[in-house]
Structures are given as structure tokens and as C-alpha cells.
Amino acid sequence: LKLMEMNDNHVEYHTVKEFLTFCVDGPDAPGAGTWKSTFPGKYLEGGKEAGGQLVDQRLLPRIDEGEVRILMAGDTCQMAIHKKPLDGLSAVGGNSAYTYYKPTDEKYKKMIETLYKDIPTLLPAMDLQGEPLPLLWTADYIPKNPEGWSKAENADDSETEYVVGEFNCSCVGISKFQ
């Protein structure tokens, strides 16, 4: 397997067995191989109740263009933020250039309207029906070409689709809250 750590963009090569051992028992476990990652692995430790989880998420190559974070207060968008990584693929960890947009800005207005339309289905889909929306939360979108795209160049803005890569209410990055 070719694995990329999205926090610092380093690449490691491991067997499936080494990767699974890392995920279940950690980098120092017998059979895990040698890891450069600073993460402790053991992603399933404690089960769902303790937050143990592993997300199978495909790599979207257009992440190098950045991601769009929609900053929400309850059910109201406060701003859209384009986070463009300065190096590598990942906008994680603050090594990015940030551009801020008002919710009414045409660039992301349709995305925000779609999120508003989808809000009633979000909590039930996450088995949180009946719970209130978080006071402050974000939805991070990653650009992608439409399925079946065969052209050498990427889709233009009018054809680009977006995939939600994360909903977050624990570390929302509000340093530029307006």
C-alpha cells in the first residue's frame, strides 16, 4: 500500500498486514513494520463508545486545489473559507492560504443553499435524530470532477462537484470569525 499522511504529506509504503496491525494495535506492535507517522494508530481501541473508528475515504486528487469550509452557527452560515494548501495535498494543520467569503458571495452561494436544504437529513443520517445542531460547526468540501470524467484537464467551476470530507464541531478553526 502507498499511504500518505494528510497532516504532513509524507508517504509510506506498507503491506496490508502492516497497515491493519498499525490500525488495530499501533506502530510498535509485532508485525506493524517501521512507521514514520507520529500518530499512535490503534484507531479502533475502545470501540465506538470510546471514539474508536476508521473511515474508508477515497483520495480526491483535487484536494491540492484546497477545500471549502462552511462555518455554521446552528443552522446559519457565517462564512465560507477556501483553504488552499501551500505545499502538498493537505489543508490540515494550518499550512494553507485562507480566503474568506460572505454567505451571500456568488462563488459558494449554491453550495451553502444545498447545505441548508440538506440539514434536515444530516442528524438522522448520523443517528442523531432529535439532537440539536451544534452551536458552532463546519462542513468541509473537497472538489472533484464529475463521475466518468475523461478529459485531461479538470472540470471548470460550473462542472466541478464537491464531496463533504468532514463535519466537525470539536475543532472548527475560528481564528478569523467575522
Where are the model-predicted features located?
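Phosphate-binding site of ATP-dependent enzymes
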Residues: 2-132, 140-157
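Glycine-rich phosphate/pyrophosphate-binding beta-alpha loops
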Residues: 83-90, 168-177
